[in-house]
């Protein structure tokens, strides 16, 4: 356990959706051409043409979050980094740019986005013994198109005052004893779709649907807001349990710009679901090599660097995430939540079940809230 994380300022402490808004879980290929064309026109010429000694990065991560890592990479290699940041639309932009795209590396969050980029045909495989040694197979694409860099767990936020138990499973959330006591964001949000896809993979589609429907019926209110809003609702007594990502707890605990969020964090305890069984569902932030990368060798060097021990620790610390490489220490704030036992399910399997998970969410009317 290390001391407090090396913070990149307070930019990451504000805004629930700094990694992109709530979204459906599949790319609408019918409108891709139109959207891609518009993006290409509106965002053209942001990055320079290919040049020796540089790498171009299209990133869904906030600039302040990745700057310390990129500065260190440049200091060690002499390779300059150019970054385009956005909250959405990068995949469509790369597709529109085609063979002339300057994109070398895609930095993204959520397995859905990473696998979606692969399915869109805008990534290419990387064969690297360094990456294979640093990142367990479950956090890598079997064909080498994406690689995980950090993990975040989808946990249960529980009221310290009203929930006595310290263990729970995802399946337990469907128990009628929790009726009217659960809050979540939209079931169609990528974070929940990833979790629900893991239920399909682990329990089978029928059992997963039963669980998702049960959670829906136990909701206190119609799904709304982001993960931090659920902690706020627990403090207000609107619900006792919520689904949320681990890193939001750290962001609330250290939020100096909006100190009221510290009170939200104080109201909850973190329960790691299925810790006594298969383990807790995790998702990743990760990287992919762009299909037409003009600086391919430099791009591979950057991805390899990002999987190194020091880079993973810095990257994870800056946003209260976990390194994907086993055995690396986490900072004291993360350690204070308890031990994480990750579900060993390959993330590629979760990606394959996301479409069905989205269909189940619609089928049970999850986002309509409880029936009564």
Predicted regions and their residues:
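Early extracytoplasmic/lumenal segment of secretory-pathway proteins
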Residues: 52-115
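Short beta-strand->loop
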Residues: 58-61, 142-143, 158-160, 165, ...
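A structural signal for short loop-to-beta-strand junctions that line the ligand-binding cleft
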Residues: 101-106, 124-156, 171, 182-184
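A bilobed periplasmic-binding-protein/Venus flytrap-type ligand-binding module shared by bacterial periplasmic
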Residues: 157-162, 197, 282-295, 314-315
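Short helix-loop capping/hinge motifs at secondary-structure junctions, enriched
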Residues: 161-168, 201-209, 293-299
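Periplasmic-binding protein-like
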Residues: 180-188, 305-329
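Ligand-binding pocket segment of bilobal, Venus flytrap-like solute-binding proteins
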Residues: 191, 198, 203-273
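Conserved C-terminal helix/tail region of periplasmic/extracytoplasmic solute-binding proteins
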Residues: 343-372
């Amino acid at each position: 356990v290390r001391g407090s994380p090396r913070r990149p300022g307070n930019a990451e402490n504000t805004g629930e959706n700094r990694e992109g808004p709530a979204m459906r879980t599949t790319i609408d290929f019918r409108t891709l051409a139109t959207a891609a064309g518009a993006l290409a026109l509106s965002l053209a010429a942001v990055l320079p043409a290919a040049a020796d000694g540089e790498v171009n990065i299209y990133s869904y991560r906030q600039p302040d979050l990745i700057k310390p890592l990129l500065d260190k990479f440049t200091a060690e290699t002499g390779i300059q980094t150019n970054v385009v940041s956005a909250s959405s639309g990068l995949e469509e932009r790369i597709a529109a740019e085609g063979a002339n795209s300057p994109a070398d590396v895609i930095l993204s969050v959520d397995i859905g986005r990473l696998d979606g980029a692969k399915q869109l045909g805008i990534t290419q495989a990387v064969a690297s013994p360094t990456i294979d040694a640093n990142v367990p197979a479950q956090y890598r694409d079997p064909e080498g198109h994406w690689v995980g860099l950090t993990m975040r767990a989808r946990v249960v936020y529980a009221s310290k005052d009203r929930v006595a138990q310290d263990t729970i499973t995802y399946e337990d959330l469907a128990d009628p004893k929790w009726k009217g006591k659960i809050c979540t964001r939209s079931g169609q949000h990528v974070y929940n779709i990833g979790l629900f896809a893991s239920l399909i993979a682990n329990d089978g589609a029928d059992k997963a649907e039963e669980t998702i429907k049960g959670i829906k019926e136990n909701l206190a209110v119609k799904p709304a807001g982001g993960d931090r809003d659920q902690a706020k609702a627990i403090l207000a007594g609107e619900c006792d349990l919520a689904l949320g990502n681990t890193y939001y707890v750290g962001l609330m605990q250290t939020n100096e710009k909006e100190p009221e969020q510290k009170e939200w964090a104080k109201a909850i305890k973190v329960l790691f679901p299925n810790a006594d069984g298969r383990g807790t569902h995790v998702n990743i932030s990760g990287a992919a090599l762009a299909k037409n990368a003009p600086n391919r060798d430099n791009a591979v060097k950057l991805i390899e660097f990002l999987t190194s021990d020091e880079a993973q620790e810095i990257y994870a610390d800056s946003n209260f995430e976990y390194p994907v490489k086993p055995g690396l220490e986490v900072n004291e704030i993360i350690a204070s939540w308890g031990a994480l036992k990750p579900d060993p399910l390959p993330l590629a399997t979760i990606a394959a079940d996301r479409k069905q998970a989205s269909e189940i969410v619609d089928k049970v009317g999850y986002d309509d809230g409880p029936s009564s």
